[in-house]
Amino acid sequence: MAYRGRFSPTNPEKYKGDPTNIVYRSSWEFRFFRFIDAHPDVIWWQSEEVAIPYLSPIDNKIHRYFPDVIMKKRVGLDKYETLMIEIKPKRQTRPPDISKKNNTPTGRISTRYLREVKTYGINEAKWNAAKKYCDDRGWRFAVITEDELGI
């Protein structure tokens, strides 16, 4: 999924922010950007334009989370919804498999397991902060994985 570049929208007037400075950090983000840029029910959208503070469970410090997408879409006649969306692999949206914890010949905790615990803990902290941010504004937060993208 290491795929990165600048996205040039077909409908730059729909983008809230600088439409010449839209960066995608994965092929999945690129695919989603193309979809929402072209979709007639998407009124506006932005990518990584909002910073949400969150407390990291790793170092107990405040960091900033930049959600992949915030968008406003039409959901009915004169009815709209604002969504904050994070695009992630499904494996990063679930707690690590505890059965793989001691997956080394010496029985020590594996580096991979520790990395997965760290990633999941940080993601969970970011997403809890994002949910609160959205709740305070009447928005909805969603994590989109390869399942929703049809990959």
Segments from the language model and where they lie:
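Electrostatic, structured charged patches in enzyme active sites and in nucleic-acid/phosphate-binding
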Residues: M1-I151
